[in-house]
A protein has these predicted regions:
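A glycine-rich (often HGG/GG-containing) alpha/beta subdomain
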Residues: 1-140
Length: 141
């Protein structure tokens, strides 16, 4: 798990807020490249998210979670921005430019499992929650 990954942690489409997660050894470096600075661990602060030309993409919030006290067990940065797909794509593309790679579906949860943050039953429950299409399936997850 040497590579730092980035992906939206919120569902696709339009919405008021989107969460973009970065996880791995370079998460703080990439987060600083996108937001100029990070808050103290386990807190939020306002930020202007910028692209590789240092042009402002959006204004939002940034959170930092230091390993091992994060969802994945790695350093994690979460950027909370407006939920326009163009903004989300621009933030993710900029994170890739700064050194992350696009996460595969379920990869944040896979890392949490591999880093002993969750067990197999919990990982399967996360997948079931995300895939639930009925109230009954949601309760069963």
């Amino acid at each position: 798990m040497a590579e730092t990954i980035i992906a939206p942690a919120s569902p696709g489409g339009r919405g008021g807020v989107a969460v973009i997660r970065i996880s791995g050894k370079e998460a703080s470096h990439i987060g600083k490249s996108l937001c100029s600075s990070l808050p103290k661990p386990w807190s939020l602060k306002p930020c202007f998210v910028v692209n590789k030309q240092k042009e402002i993409i959006d204004q939002g919030l940034v959170a930092f979670f230091r390993a091992p006290k994060s969802y994945t067990g790695e350093d994690v940065v979460e950027i909370h921005c407006h939920g326009n797909p163009l903004i989300v794509d621009s933030v993710v593309s900029s994170g890739i430019f700064f050194g992350a790679r696009l996460a595969e579906p379920g990869e944040f949860t896979k890392r949490a499992f591999l880093n002993n943050k969750i067990d197999l039953a919990q990982a399967e429950s996360v997948a079931d929650l995300i895939a639930s299409e009925t109230s009954q399936a949601l309760r069963g997850a």
